[in-house]
Amino acid sequence: MNQPAAQTVTGYFDSSALVKRYLVETGTLWVQTWCQNQNQTVAIAEIGLVEIAAAFAGKLRGAHITPVQYDSARADLAIDAQAEYVLVAVNRTVVDEAIELTSQHRLRGYDAVHLACALILNRALVARDLLPLVFVSADNDLLNAAAGEGLSTENPNSHI
């Protein structure tokens, strides 16, 4: 008897989580495993790519990575963003929801944007009878806000 195909699980990653795919940190193995799983998808706000690139540059300036590692990480991010990731555009609807979230939770500006993107994407998934997303971040305040909004959460730092 044929087994039904497994539904894809979407993980919405903020930059603090997805950067771990490219730089070795606590939680790197867990993030890399998620990204390699054929039944799991990675979603991120387009602005998250800028945040990740800035993290790479900061690591380079701090001499935590070499110029070769920096170039490789940037190139890999560009390839993955084009080929693998669901990129969530930041539009007026996202901005309005993010503004509202800042009044309800202890969030920095871009963290509110990430959460708004995830909530909007989650509503779209559920409306299509797809599995709700998992919100992935290494930021505890952001994870608490996401959980408060009803999202399932994962902290890659909890997976050593």
Enumerate the language-model features and the residues they cover:
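Active-site neighborhoods of divalent-metal-dependent phosphate/nucleic-acid chemistry enzymes
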Residues: 83-141
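Aromatic- and histidine-enriched alpha-helix N-cap/loop-to-helix transition segments
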Residues: 44-50, 110-113
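Acidic, PIN/NYN-like endoribonuclease modules and their adjacent C-terminal/linker elements
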Residues: 1-10, 121-160
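Short glycine/serine- and small hydrophobic-enriched flexible loop segments
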Residues: 54-61, 119-123
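Short, well-structured N-terminal submotif of metal-dependent ribonuclease cores
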Residues: 1-48, 59-72, 151, 157-160
